[in-house]
Curated annotation (Swiss-Prot):
Keyword Transmembrane part of the UniProt annotation: no
Keyword Iron-sulfur on entry: no
Family: Belongs to the RdgC family.
Protein species of origin: Vibrio vulnificus (strain CMCP6)
Record-level Gene Ontology MF annotations: double-stranded DNA binding
Protein name: Recombination-associated protein RdgC
Keywords: Cytoplasm, DNA recombination
Xref: Pfam families: RdgC
GO CC list: bacterial nucleoid; cytoplasm
PANTHER family associated with the record: RECOMBINATION-ASSOCIATED PROTEIN RDGC
Chain's role: May be involved in recombination.
Cellular compartment(s): Cytoplasm, Nucleoid
GO biological process, one term: DNA recombination
Amino acid sequence: MWFKNCMVYRVNREIEFNADQLEKQLAEFRYTPCGSQDKQKFGWVSAMGRHGDMMTHVSEDRILICAKKEEKMLPASVIKESLNAKVEAMEAQEGRPLKKKEKETLKEEIIIDLLPRAFSRSNHTYVLILPKEGFILVDASSYKKAEDVLALLRKTMGSLPVVPAIPEKAVETTLTEWVKTGQTPQGFHLLDEAELKSVLEDGGIIRCKKQELTSDEILSHIAADKVVTKLALNWQERLEFVLADDASIKRLKFSDELRDQNDDIPREDQAARFDADFSLMCGELSAFLPNLFQALGGLPHPNA
């Protein structure tokens, strides 16, 4: 449940997040497994997994939900091989090349034939709604994956007026300034990892790990018109993360000291531990995100 990534969206119009109402709405779009002819299924599952029955998990006004996507695995190479064999056989039988539409029909028939025997893969994506802060957070590795889940939530709720939380000032400008000067806003500290890109279209990319970021070597790259597009940071010794120029937060790691706070709860009591960990995570993110966006120069007006 602890988020590893954080795609942050902000609510840009007034909307009420009622946990009881959302519970009913999510149930209408509950995940069901793929049938023999389904390529994929996408729906909501219990936020607590096998440890709970409710679709939502709530602490104060904060709401956690979870989407599950199941996809049938049909390797393109397998489809292509089957298609080539069928096309070759039919062209030999009919003594003419098949038309494009005929090949497409054959391909669909092959997919229909393979689907019942295909393996499935599943993944879960958590969404955290923070009404007081006006944020919706998605634990996804890209905005594309986050948008897929938010599209399902929008369909579920009927309306979801959100936009990515992107600061007014270009993030790479701020990150470059932090590295160039070696100075960061209070509470934030540079770690030892960064990515720098040339401002030129065909320019190079430098990725460095375990590197002193204020060294002459790194500063020489900045002097040669490279900007910092990813930067590893620490916040108040409580969070470590990599911030990218699109304002996405990756490799989010909560401190051991924080995570150990609930060690007095017996491991066997999974539901109680989940609830306590959720409250801790919400508290940290609710303090961290406003602090981060303030350090980045602030977000534009919600209706801008």
